[in-house]
Amino acid sequence: LLYLRCNLPFNKVLVNFIVFYLYLEMTNKKEISAAIIIIGNEVLSGRTKDLNTSTLATWLNSLGISVGEVRVIPDVEKTIIDTVHELRVKYNYVFTTGGIGPTHDDITAESISKAFNIEYGFHKEAFAILEKYYEPGNFNDGRQKMAKMPVTANLILNPTSGAPGF
């Protein structure tokens, strides 16, 4: 399961990481499928335009990975958990965007932790990355929240905003 920060353009580091990871998987499987989950009340209400679905689906299909489904869901814990559980049994990969920022309604990371029964807390490496990214005195509680995720997560570096995905 890979998570991308909401509505940020794909960067080369992220793309290279995912290409390498999926290449390793593709060498062992004949057909690979994926689903995309867009998480956010702001997308459902129309306040924020989803900029990732087309880019991600086009890119995955160009790699020979068939995108079988795209869903837009609200920032609701049960909905996130249920959707992840449903799609992960149908597809080889589930990509998500949204819901892992600094605001109170960004609950994706915690919901994913619960879905996989993994401890949720400050990820030491993510915390260090963010602490270094922000100037002294600007690494407030909201920004620190972006370092909370499944504690065993593998990070996807994000030079655009500093906040790593996982």
Segments the model singles out, each with a brief description of its role:
Residues 4, 8, 14-17, 22-24:
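Short hydrophobic targeting helices and cationic amphipathic motifs
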Residues 38, 44, 96-99, 103, ...:
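Short glycine/serine/threonine-biased micro-segments
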Residues 31, 54-115, 132-135, 146:
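N-terminal small/polar loop signature for handling phosphorylated ligands or for N-terminal nucleophile
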Residues 39, 43-53:
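Glycine- and acidic-residue-enriched helix-capping/strand-helix junction motifs
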